[in-house]
A protein has these predicted regions:
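Active-site beta->alpha loop and helix N-cap motifs at the rims of alpha/beta catalytic domains
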Residues: 2-10, 15-18, 23-100, 128
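Catalytic cores of alpha/beta
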Residues: 7-15, 65-66, 93, 113-120, ...
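Conserved, mostly hydrophobic/aromatic
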Residues: 24, 82, 116-118, 172, ...
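Glycine-rich phosphate-binding active-site loops on the catalytic face of alpha/beta enzymes
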Residues: 25-28, 108, 122-135, 175-196
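Active-site-adjacent beta->alpha loops and helix N-cap segments on the catalytic face
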Residues: 30-41, 59-65, 84-99, 110-119, ...
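Short catalytic-loop micro-motif centered on adjacent basic/acidic residues
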Residues: 81-83, 104-106, 157-160
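C-terminal alpha-helical cap/extension of soluble enzyme domains
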Residues: 149-213
Length: 213
């Protein structure tokens, strides 16, 4: 789930097989609360599932220190994933953070090449809709990354992000994407279909005089 809103997280966990929660500075800013306050509440809500926290430092050494600081402050363990944008220093930091024994999600990925360089991470997160917005093809990029990882037997998994509609999630799932992270609104829309609603209404009408037990 790509949200830091506690009410949304609680509701989504009632309906979906969610493995964890992803956050970034923009998502966290929507809550108008401090990082420490929001993350502490998320921890209680998700009960040991994956928690992805994005670093904001620019130098590799600072990214490592920031990752360690979050780990120690929130007493995180194997469910903690350090989100690192794939800048030049970010690539360096990915190796450093992995060597320090922490999980890594390489984020802000827009090309197959970026994903391949960052494949030492546990997850790579290509931005589907942002690619579509600049006249690129987000689904094709995800597909290329999946194919490349399979070709070279790379263990890193693809965690697609940045979705505008349900069809994008359908299409990344059909090209073998390992996981997706999406907003509350998108995940809620996945559950619905007007023909399902019509079918249920028809069943209710047809059952009105025959269900007697």
């Amino acid at each position: 789930a790509d949200t830091a809103n506690i009410d949304e997280i609680k509701e989504l966990f009632n309906y979906f097989p969610i493995d964890g929660v992803t956050t970034n500075p923009t998502i966290l800013s929507h809550e108008n609360k401090t990082l420490s306050s929001v993350v502490a509440k998320i921890q209680k809500c998700i009960e040991g599932k994956m928690l992805h926290i994005q670093t904001i430092s620019e130098e590799a050494e600072d990214i490592l220190h920031e990752a360690k600081r979050y780990r120690d402050y929130f007493e995180l363990n194997d469910n903690y994933y350090v989100k690192i944008p794939v800048t030049k220093n970010g690539y360096k930091a990915i190796k450093m953070v992995k060597d320090a024994g922490m999980n890594v999600t390489a984020t802000a990925i827009f090309t197959q090449q970026q994903a391949l360089i960052a494949a030492g991470a546990d997850f790579v997160a290509p931005y589907v809709n942002r690619l579509d917005n600049i006249s690129s093809h987000g689904i094709e990029v995800v597909s290329d990354i999946v194919k490349t990882f399979k070709l070279y037997d790379i263990k890193c998994k693809v965690l697609a992000a940045s979705f505008k509609n349900v069809d994008q999630i359908y299409r990344v799932s059909m090209v073998g994407c390992h996981a997706v992270t999406a907003s509350y609104e998108i995940l809620e829309a996945i559950m619905k279909h007007p023909m399902t609603d019509k079918g249920v209404l028809d069943f209710k009408k047809d059952s009105s005089n025959i269900y007697d037990v």
